[in-house]
A protein has these predicted regions:
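AAA+/SF3 P-loop NTPase mechanochemical coupling elements
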Residues: 132-143, 147, 155-161, 172-191, ...
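Conserved RecA-like P-loop NTPase ATPase core
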Residues: 59, 81, 104, 118, ...
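Catalytic acidic motif of RecA-like/P-loop NTPases
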Residues: 20, 152-153, 163
Length: 353
């Protein structure tokens, strides 16, 4: 910046050359980090996450606080809710941001290779082993963060060895006798109910309590209705907005269950980008068949639990409505639909007519 005095008014002029230089330096830094860490770099930041809904705002608020610590974090949520995006954001907001971010997906690595991938191996450890051996993912993540994705798919034998690594903070390569100290921050993730797996004898309780120091639960997309259209705008790079759809299409999108969560929403955006007509709004016939089929079959929107309803609307209101809907001994409804609508409208509550 440069200061300039004009008739007693001081202004500041941005030197675009300096801005361009700063951007170039940032780009070079990213490239150098990518080369230094062999591609193990976190790609996402908190600013990349859509937080138009209160549920996600709460999760991200907690995640920002945890980023400043070295605590182990367990991220839970359905498949496609963005667990790796959140893990990357935590890493990039931490003091380890310029260090490696290494992801290990237990569901993607074959069982016979997972130990050598995680912990590395020495030369001659097995047939086909590389000369001079190979560092494992834990060694590659030294001073940085290791993201243990789909940890619920790890076998019991791998869980036992993983527990020791997390507790002792050291690894032993396959075929070696010496240990290597490591300094890593651990973020684990799963779309499975680990407590249920413990009851079934498929997951170690000691490992569960070791990784579940702090838990962040990502909400499914069906509980983030306010974020659906902002996400569509983000995925389409601003080319598709809520105003691009007919009211019919908006209703279908907002009441759909989204079992594939963010992945399915991104797929829909790609589909619409090809199928849409530039001259008119996007209607039902330009949506993917899975979504329109659910609507044509009288698809029922996700039904929240009683606890969720009470949390959102308050116990007194919910109890009163339940009393209004209560049936008498003859099975007849005590109050009509119009009675209930009048009750809501009298209290200036939004309702569908």
């Amino acid at each position: 910046f440069a200061s300039v005095e004009l008739s007693g008014i001081t202004t500041r002029i941005v030197r675009f050359r300096d801005v361009n230089r700063a951007q170039a330096n940032d780009s070079n830094m990213r490239r150098l980090l990518y080369q230094k860490h062999k591609g193990h770099v976190a790609k996402y930041h908190f600013e990349n996450l859509c937080m138009a809904d209160s549920a996600m705002q709460k999760v991200v608020g907690t995640a920002r606080s945890l980023a400043a610590t070295n605590y182990t974090i367990l991220i839970t949520g359905e498949s496609g809710t963005g667990k790796e995006l959140l893990a990357s954001s935590i890493h990039n907001a931490s003091a380890r941001a310029n260090c490696p971010f290494v992801a290990a997906n237990f569901a993607a690595i074959p069982e016979n290779l997972i130990e050598s991938e995680l912990f590395g191996y020495e030369e001659g450890a097995f047939t086909g082993a590389k000369k001079h051996g190979k560092a494992g993912l834990f060694e590659l993540a030294h001073t940085g963060t290791i993201f243990l994705d789909e940890i619920g798919d790890a076998s019991l034998s791998v869980q036992a060895r993983l527990l020791r690594v997390l507790e002792e903070k050291e690894v032993m390569r396959v075929g070696d006798t010496k240990v290597t100290p490591i300094d890593v921050r651990v973020i684990a993730a799963t779309n499975k109910d680990l407590r249920e797996l413990i009851r079934q004898g498929q997951f170690r309780s000691d490992l569960y309590f070791r990784i579940n120091v702090f838990q962040l639960m990502l909400p499914p997309l069906r509980e983030r209705t306010e974020s659906i259209f902002p996400l569509i705008g983000s995925f389409s790079r601003g080319k598709i907005a809520r105003e691009s759809f007919t009211e019919n299409a908006i209703h279908i999108i907002e009441t759909y269950d989204w079992p594939g969560n963010l992945r399915e929403l991104r797929n829909m955006v790609d589909y619409i980008s090809i199928m849409r007509s530039r001259k008119k709004k996007i209607d039902e016939d330009q949506l993917p068949i899975d979504i329109t089929a659910a609507a044509s079959q009288g698809y029922q929107p996700y039904c929240p639990s009683m606890e969720q309803v009470i949390s959102r609307f308050g116990r007194p209101l919910v109890q009163t409505l339940l009393e209004l809907l209560a049936q008498n001994k003859d099975g007849e409804i005590r109050y009509s639909r119009s009675d209930i609508l009048q009750y809501l409208q009298a209290r200036k509550l939004r309702c569908s007519t």
